[in-house]
Design a protein with these regions (language model features):
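Extended alpha-helical targeting/anchoring segments
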Residues: 1-314
Length: 314
């Protein structure tokens, strides 16, 4: 079992004070499973998991599919009440706490590993704008009760390399007691490989609608919004606006199979499946908006404005 980096290399890197964690990895062939089948295994051992992937413009799959489960910590905030693991604080600046957390997880980059080797996965709601731009008053009725932010800290990553037909298993180890933590990481990699090969899959309950799909606004209300938007455009108040009308329906089951179909019929640059404490999300979008890579932000030259998103509260 070839583990990278070696213990000797880790000891050398640990002497650099700017790092406090380090990704230890193991490669295996991927011909015995698929990302969806792997997700079924992960859902059998953890209710908290995610899948991130992309399809390129020529409809071939992007290079990496990332999966994670069993987060080390969950971080949420709603109405200024922030929960970091078991710690509860009241704050008007949750971003400050997030920066403090990320400061404790600085790791070196390795050319043989994908760009994402662990970190925070989750969502920021539109209401989060109130923390970063308090001058922007957006007073709307909260009909869904989503958290302002819900993030999970994943220190283990399963990366499908779709170009090389390999699976890269990654475990992030702290650098306070190098030899002990390295051996622990190696053991976790072995357990993770065994889980992927022989783990029991959670039976997919499927999903079905229990009632009619209804819009948030009826036709008269929506047309009134359109007329107001046209007025503000003519007045020069705005130059672009996206009017949306959420469709909702009672639902039972899981969105995993929905995501499985979605990634097939609508392969997109930005596709995601996320399962948390009280929400499950499956989505596909033609826009990645911003990708941060090696301290450089990359933005698409053109981005569409439509996003297909399905979410279920549990």
């Amino acid at each position: 079992m070839k583990i990278l980096p070696t213990l000797a290399e880790v000891k050398k890197l640990a002497s650099d004070a700017k790092y406090n964690v380090l990704p230890v990895s193991y490669e295996m062939l991927s011909d015995f499973t698929t990302p969806i089948e792997t997700m079924k295994i992960l859902k059998n051992v953890s209710t908290h998991c995610y899948m991130l992937e992309s399809a390129q413009a020529n409809e071939t799959w992007g290079r990496y599919t990332f999966l994670g489960f069993n987060p080390k910590m969950e971080i949420t905030c709603m109405d200024g009440k922030m929960k970091i693991g078991n710690l509860k604080v009241k704050t008007e600046n949750p971003s400050g706490y997030l920066r403090q957390i990320l400061a404790d997880y600085k790791s070196p980059r390795f050319d043989y590993l994908p760009s994402f080797t662990g970190g925070l996965v989750g969502y920021f709601s539109y209401d989060y704008l109130g923390y970063s731009e308090p001058s922007v008053k957006c007073i709307v009725e909260d009909t869904e009760n989503f958290k302002d932010v819900d993030l999970m800290l994943f220190d283990k990553v399963i990366a499908f390399d779709n170009l090389r037909q390999k699976i890269i298993l990654i475990v992030n180890m702290p650098l306070d007691d190098v030899e002990v933590e390295y051996n622990k990481a190696v053991m976790e990699l072995k357990q993770l490989a065994e889980l992927l090969k022989n783990g029991e899959k959670k039976k997919d309950p499927g999903g079905r609608l229990l009632g009619e799909v209804t819009p948030l606004f009826d036709k008269v209300q929506f047309c009134d919004m359109v007329e107001k938007a046209k007025h503000h455009i003519r007045e020069g108040d705005i130059f672009q606006i996206v009017l949306s009308n959420r469709l909702s329906a009672p639902f039972e089951g899981s969105l995993l199979n929905t995501y499985r179909v979605l990634r097939t019929i609508n392969p997109s640059p930005y596709m995601f499946y996320f399962s948390g404490t009280d929400v499950e999300v499956a989505g596909a979008s033609p826009e990645t908006l911003v990708k941060l890579f090696l301290a450089s932000a990359h933005m698409p030259t053109a981005a569409a404005r439509e996003t297909l998103l399905q979410a279920v509260h549990h």
